[in-house]
């Protein structure tokens, strides 16, 4: 019998459990997130992590709540003015979910980096908002060397900016959109071939004929097609139309010679493209197999790469060039008995393949002196059912992005083919940071400074472009606009960015879905966004 607490939790988190499952929720509840600066953007991010039940969070902020903070931050009130910003925000955020533990550190990140940089290495992930460039570079370096993920978030006027910094992020459950079914009709495994041979469409009662699964129907007519075309699978549009006609001819006729209403045959005709999907290993999986980390297994090799290597060995041996069978089939018109039998054929093959991969895993673990049980059966099943969708994301460090010799000029210059591309906003953010470094403030923070700062900001932009050897032109309109922003943090933009950033944090923690690589820019002016590898 299920425990009452567990039932309540399932009810509370029902919708998200459908997205990332029990194991994803467990990862979320075990995570400790660090937020640097309780700004409007920062508290919006935490709000979207506290509500789904993040384990715990710590806010680092040495600032006191100002009137401006209370005006643009939903989690700070007039009564908060004068209090430490981290403490005030933490108290309000904790009210959202009693399952979540919150804490705060009343100190600036600069002081912590000076006195105790290892402090940041205790967290699952660090989220930094509205930090100065110099502080970001120091923080990013500490976390990069400790392999702690860092998400930089910034709201600047009508611009939203995010940067993910993570050395390597492997994903087993990438949840691709419109994933193709794994039916293997072009390369039927022996158990499937034997099951298909048990059907004889030409000598069936009408009831059985109209309740035969469409997978069986397509397989039967595919065998007939092979006989007529020397084993060539239908590929072109015309060939697939001819194949559909061949299936259509198999629909039973009534006593008047008119076709019967057989929905399963119509379903088969609609699913020709799905069924004739070629069984092959995606190039992205081949890249993983050829990666040095997959080839060279040691005692320190992470679980993902041991699983990937076992998968590679399965493909070379038992799989005969193919990945493990996924073991699922779509819903279809069929009687329960026929559907379940067909479903079991795929399920049993999937179990058999998973067991074979498991044997390779055990041998690999033993070869590097690790216990065979150190990788669970659950992890093994997840790998096999998602073997076609594995992903590895590797981001560049912030030091590489900012380095004169390592800056990704090609990405910036090619994006500037369109003078209004979102990459312009990135260039402007770099320019305002240079402005701050030179003048100790951001451009246009006071109304009387807007006009006089236009020339100064343009000079900073020109200097930045020249220093990095970027032969691109930025419209003056953008310089004027960024001066008018005055480094403001509008709550509408902060709220949007908070939702987007929390989504990426959850992806990193649960290791499900695919994070962007590595920079995301949102334009509130044009309501568009783009990602770049910088």
UniProtKB/Swiss-Prot annotation:
Gene Ontology MF, one: NEDD8 activating enzyme activity
Pathway note: Protein modification; protein neddylation
Record text on activity regulation: Binding of TP53BP2 to the regulatory subunit NAE1 decreases neddylation activity.
Record has Cell membrane as a keyword: yes
Gene Ontology BP annotations: mitotic DNA replication checkpoint signaling; neuron apoptotic process; protein neddylation; regulation of neuron apoptotic process; regulation of postsynapse assembly
Post-translational modifications: Ubiquitinated by TRIP12, leading to its degradation by the proteasome.
Residues found modified as N-acetylalanine: 2
GO cellular component labels: glutamatergic synapse; plasma membrane; protein-containing complex
Annotated positions of the N6-acetyllysine modification: 6, 341
Cell compartments where the protein resides: Cell membrane
Keywords associated with the record: Acetylation, Apoptosis, Cell cycle, Cell membrane, Membrane, Ubl conjugation, Ubl conjugation pathway
Residue numbers spanned by region Interaction with UBA3: 331-344
Signal peptide region: none
Site (Interaction with UBA3): 211
Main location: membrane
Subunit structure: Heterodimer of UBA3 and NAE1. The complex binds NEDD8 and UBE2M. Binds APP and TP53BP2.
Family: Belongs to the ubiquitin-activating E1 family. ULA1 subfamily.
UniProt function note: Regulatory subunit of the dimeric UBA3-NAE1 E1 enzyme. E1 activates NEDD8 by first adenylating its C-terminal glycine residue with ATP, thereafter linking this residue to the side chain of the catalytic cysteine, yielding a NEDD8-UBA3 thioester and free AMP. E1 finally transfers NEDD8 to the catalytic cysteine of UBE2M. Necessary for cell cycle progression through the S-M checkpoint. Overexpression of NAE1 causes apoptosis through deregulation of NEDD8 conjugation.
Protein known as: NEDD8-activating enzyme E1 regulatory subunit
Lineage of source species: Eukaryota, Metazoa, Chordata, Craniata, Vertebrata
Encoding gene (name): Nae1
